[in-house]
């Protein structure tokens, strides 16, 4: 079995910061900043997901992409990636996350509409918001 040699950090409402212990409370409902650290060793950008779905689903999506990179697959902004969900691809878009470029996983809504579609459902429609604008207020954890 392949070794997962990266980490996933989830910054979300109700989650205590591992560094300072403060509990996050500044994201809109259903939004978070989940991302990997460790893809650099594969000469690949890390991944980010901003929909606050279950931690298990976040882990599944980010680890599935990480395992594919570990196996030699390379992704770039604009790619439509099959095989994460049975009924639709996900798209990878380039975003900044704490000063580094990441590939954000963009998941279509229940009608398979991506966020640029004016009929895209919330919270899926929120996925194109820049990372530094995801929070509702300046507070939050360190």
Question: What are these model-predicted stretches?
Answer:
Residues 1-31, 39-142:
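Acidic, proline/glycine-rich low-complexity IDRs
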């Amino acid at each position: 079995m392949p070794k997962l040699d990266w980490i996933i950090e989830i910054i979300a409402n109700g989650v205590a910061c591992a560094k300072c212990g403060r509990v996050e409370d500044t994201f809109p409902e259903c939004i978070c900043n989940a991302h990997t650290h460790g893809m650099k060793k594969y000469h690949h950008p890390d991944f980010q997901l901003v929909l606050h779905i279950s931690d298990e689903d976040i882990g599944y999506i980010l680890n599935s992409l990480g395992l594919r990179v570990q196996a030699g697959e390379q992704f770039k902004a604009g790619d439509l990636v099959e095989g994460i969900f049975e009924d639709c691809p996900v798209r990878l878009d380039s975003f900044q996350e704490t000063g580094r470029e990441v590939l954000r996983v963009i998941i279509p809504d229940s009608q398979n509409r991506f966020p640029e579609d004016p009929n895209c459902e919330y919270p899926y429609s929120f996925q194109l918001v820049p990372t530094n604008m995801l929070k509702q207020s300046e507070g939050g954890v360190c």
